[in-house]
């Protein structure tokens, strides 16, 4: 059986850990009490989430490494802003933030600039 995982940004995607929901909640509590290593474990435990999101943006002409790094920025922002008081799974909260960071990156690095008013007209048509 062959593995389809690759190394992106120096990270071997085949060896990425996956956190369970209970582990994630425990790490969020530790992070909120000030433990820095808990944040690092949360980031490392959710890198597969970033990988699954960047697959949507594969055919945009951008390097996968760049998309992965930008997705990780969105992941870190979502980890910092996540509230355990809400009854929401972390992945449900994080995916829109990761997508938003990637879209912002793609929009800002696009060589063709389209004004917002023209874009709005195009969406209405």
UniProtKB/Swiss-Prot annotation:
Transcription keyword on record: yes
Keywords for the protein's UniProt record, in alphabetical order: DNA-binding, Sigma factor, Transcription, Transcription regulation
Gene3D superfamilies with a match to the protein in the record: 1.20.120.1810
One annotated GO molecular function: sigma factor activity
Single Gene Ontology BP annotation: DNA-templated transcription initiation
InterPro entries: RNA_pol_sigma-70_dom, RNA_pol_sigma70, RNA_pol_sigma70_r2, RNA_pol_sigma_r2, Sigma-70_RNA_pol_init_factors
Family, as annotated: Belongs to the sigma-70 factor family.
Protein name: Putative RNA polymerase sigma-G factor
